[in-house]
Swiss-Prot record:
One of its GO terms (cellular component) is host cell nucleus. It comes from Tomato pseudo-curly top virus (TPCTV). Keywords: Capsid protein, DNA-binding, Host nucleus, T=1 icosahedral capsid protein, Viral penetration into host nucleus, Virion, Virus entry into host cell. Its main location: virion. This is Capsid protein.
């Protein structure tokens, strides 16, 4: 039998052979097989930054600046002046102070992840982010972000934790008839698809609040009463210039 050669076209965006519109072909013979393969996109290089902190917070609230990445080649550093915060895993624990635990009351601890699109030279306070309004219940704050600040502050995630005191000091045995004490509470939350664009001063190698021009991420903790808190946060980010 005479030698025959089969000519078929191949599209790089598909694994199946289709018509001959692309101009690219695969020559199939009994002795050779030549393919024009589709190139694979290289995955993004994700860096990991872990930040841990603990302190005391009053009923005025506190704000912690999260993405203070310095410039460098390490996994906990930013690669350039633009970084993309992809996701975050946060572990937050709060506990009543001894004075609050000795009262028979229920308290609420509000928390939020907020991005500041116009950060200044110094760290903002809770009163700069939230405005308060009269509350129908004692020991409960009603707060909101003012309309003129909506373009500056955006809430990424938020929630609250409840704590209860039963009139006994922390560590005391419960007396009969006393309400249950809940002097400690915690959250373990993975926040994905954040995609926050963090822009730093190109002339600065530090990541402090004065060096970031856009995309400062804050952890806001606002309790009804003085508490102790501690958190560990793992942030996943990549180079925004790549």
């Amino acid at each position: 039998m005479p030698y025959k050669r089969k000519l078929t076209s191949y599209f790089p965006q598909s694994k199946r052979f289709r018509g001959a519109k692309s101009g690219m072909a695969v020559v199939k013979t009994s002795a050779s097989r030549r393919l024009y393969k589709k190139g694979k996109r290289k995955p993004d290089r994700i860096k990991t930054y872990t930040y841990a902190f603990s302190s005391i917070c009053t009923d005025k609230g506190t704000i912690v600046y999260m993405n203070s990445w310095s410039l460098g080649l390490g996994p906990q550093q930013r690669s350039s002046d633009i970084e993309i915060l992809k996701s975050m895993y946060i572990r937050l624990t709060v506990a009543l102070s001894e004075n609050a635990a000795s009262q028979v009351k229920t308290y609420v601890v509000k928390w939020a992840l907020i991005v500041d699109q116009v950060p200044g030279e110094t760290l903002v306070g809770v009163a700069d982010v939230y405005k308060t309004c009269p509350s129908p219940y004692p020991y409960v704050q009603c707060a909101y972000i003012a309309d003129d600040n909506h373009s500056r502050f955006q809430v990424l995630r938020s929630g609250f934790l409840s704590l209860s005191g039963n009139g006994l000091a922390v560590g005391s045995s419960t007396r009969t008839g006393c309400p249950a004490m809940k002097n400690m509470a915690s959250i373990n939350k993975f926040c994905k698809n954040l995609n926050v664009r963090c822009v730093y001063d190109a002339d600065s190698a530090t990541g402090d609040i004065a060096s970031i021009k856009r995309g400062a991420v804050y952890l806001v903790i606002w309790p009804d009463v003085e508490i102790r808190y501690g958190f560990s946060c793992t942030m996943y980010h990549r180079n925004g210039n790549a």
